[in-house]
A protein has these predicted regions:
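Extracellular, repeat-based ectodomains that mediate carbohydrate processing or recognition
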Residues: 20-402
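Bacterial Sec-dependent N-terminal signal peptides
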Residues: 1-25, 117
Length: 402
């Protein structure tokens, strides 16, 4: 049976939640993960899968009102290796554009893979375009990201053999100009090719374009190097300069954070980048108030095993660490950066790159931080393992969140 992924968009107009919810401890599931998983940039779809719903009733969240529309269909289900990219924008007039990695083939080669695009003028959800049949690009691509650019335009970035961008001056209509190559880095130890991009724009008329990306180079069958980069355009995407990401200032750009484990947001002249997804490093946020010319670092979550070598016996711990898996970032109109992290439990019970992840209703949740805070997220009892812990033992058994 061919698997089809239906991409739908919901606009949340109301939300209410109760304060406490009791869950039995048996809901927790354990998984073994290898931190050195190779990501190659031409990831294969997972193939045919059947999903069986297991309905439950929960008082935690109730949607009061929501507009929803199906905007595209794809048989390619691997939309990210970690974070979801900037796949949607809403312009000042309410218009919404959505992109996704799209294919209509049911095989593993997905030669038609590329960017599917749909557009809704002025935010009227009854007036979405027809579901796309063909990709925007002329070649096989993946991992699209989109943003407004200029007075009324839009810019699309995706990866093939490196990164390219496509631009049009009027959002939602007209021909795309491209591909315009975003240069791969020069002077690096290995010949890295940029992939897995996230794009955002800032400045007057959104003409300054910021792209964060990762790259991976295979050294031999057992070793590879990954590195984080930042590309910037000051003319709406026509010309580019690529350099190391702001992580470079702390010597953390290489072999620390994973590809696809980063996010970017802009508002006015403010730019913020989030890096997480590493059990060997802190969760870091870099903020610029001058459109990406200079950066300041903030630690969102302090990893008690920051910088540890997996082969070091001191990296072994059986006392659960509540740590981040993925994250999201936004900047409000006052320039405040908001960070959300989803939380899992981790144990590294033996030397080596494998660790155990516990996820389930007694572990999952969302931790929040913003840069008005003067310190990273901390536990009230001072236990660094529990700084992101959201569920506590409840009287009478189970876990309580509230």
């Amino acid at each position: 049976m061919k698997k089809t992924l239906l991409i739908s968009l919901g606009l949340v107009l109301g939300l209410s939640a109760t304060a406490q919810y009791r869950i039995p401890q048996t809901e927790l599931k354990a998984y073994t993960v290898n931190s050195k998983k190779e990501i190659v940039g031409d990831e294969k779809a997972t193939g045919t899968m059947n999903y069986v719903a297991n309905p439950t009733q929960s008082p935690v969240i109730r949607w009061e009102s929501m507009n929803e529309a199906a905007v595209m269909m794809t048989t390619y289900d691997l939309q990210s290796n970690a974070y979801v990219s900037n796949r949607m924008y809403q312009a000042g007039d309410g218009s919404v554009a959505v992109v996704a990695t799209m294919s209509h083939e049911s095989n593993q080669t997905v030669n038609d893979r590329g960017t599917g695009y749909n557009f809704c003028q002025n935010g009227d959800f009854s007036k979405w375009g027809n579901m796309p049949e063909n990709r925007i690009e002329s070649m096989k691509t993946g991992w699209p990201t989109i943003a407004t650019v200029g007075a009324n335009g839009e810019i699309l970035v995706s990866h093939a053999d490196g990164l390219n961008c496509w631009i049009r001056t009027t959002k939602g209509e007209g021909e795309w100009e491209g591909p315009i190559a975003i240069p791969n880095p020069e002077g690096t130890q290995y010949p890295y090719k940029l992939s897995w991009a996230r794009a955002a724009t800032s400045g007057t008329d959104n003409n300054i374009v910021h792209v964060i990306s990762g790259a991976q180079h295979k050294i031999d069958n057992d070793h590879y190097s990954r590195c984080m980069f930042y590309s910037r355009s000051t003319d709406g995407g026509q010309t580019w300069i690529t350099d190391y990401s702001p992580l470079r200032s702390d010597s953390l750009e290489t072999d620390v954070y994973s590809n696809d484990s980063y996010a970017i947001a802009t508002n006015g002249n403010n730019v913020a980048i989030l890096y997480t997804g590493s059990l060997q490093a802190h969760v870091l946020m870099y903020k610029s108030t001058d459109n990406g010319q200079t950066w300041q670092k903030r630690i969102v979550w302090e990893n008690p095993y920051n910088g540890i070598d997996w082969d070091d016996p001191q990296s072994v711990y059986t006392d659960t660490v509540y740590g981040p898996a993925n994250g999201a970032i936004a900047i409000d109109n006052n320039g405040v950066v908001h960070v959300a992290l989803n939380v899992y439990e981790y144990i590294h019970s033996e030397v080596g790159t494998s660790y155990t992840v516990f996820r389930g209703l007694t572990s999952d949740g969302i931790a929040y931080w913003n840069d008005t805070e003067t310190t990273p997220i901390t536990d009230a009892d001072g236990n660094p393992h529990d700084a992101l812990r959201l569920w506590k033992p409840a009287a009478g058994g189970g876990s309580m969140h509230g």
